[in-house]
Amino acid sequence: MRTRNILLASLLIALCGCQPEMPKKYASKAAEWQLASNTGCFMCHTTGKNLMGPAWESVADRYRNNPDAEAHLTNIIINGGSGAWISRDMPGYPEKLLSVENRKILVKFILSLE
């Protein structure tokens, strides 16, 4: 576990500042895009293709009509998740890393993508 955390921290440092170009169709969501960038989401996720994690449009498609989607995705962001998409685990982002309000913004942003 310690080795994994060290590797994750090293990756975060190495990729600091990496941000994919925002697709023009999401221009109205620039603030949410920037929040995702500042939070480090783009190290594993992006739009239009899978990276280490699933493309966000795929997440939106899977959960869009699920009445529990916001709660489910919020729980994954807080506690992390594994096995739902690919073989890699997603680390959790507790409140000390990502505020309740910012988690809500990110979940709504992800679910709004088409």
What are these regions (language model features)?
Residues 1-7:
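Bacterial N-terminal signal peptides that target proteins for export
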Residues 14-17:
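C-terminal motif of bacterial Sec signal peptides marking the signal peptidase cleavage site
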Residues 54-60, 79-103:
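Axial heme c-ligation environment in periplasmic c-type cytochrome domains
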Residues 27, 106-113:
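Aromatic- and Gly/Pro-enriched helix-to-coil junctions and flexible linker segments
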Residues 19-37, 62:
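Electrostatic cytochrome c docking/interface patches
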Residues 33, 46-79:
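Gly/Gly-Pro-rich "capping" loops immediately C-terminal to redox-active cysteine motifs
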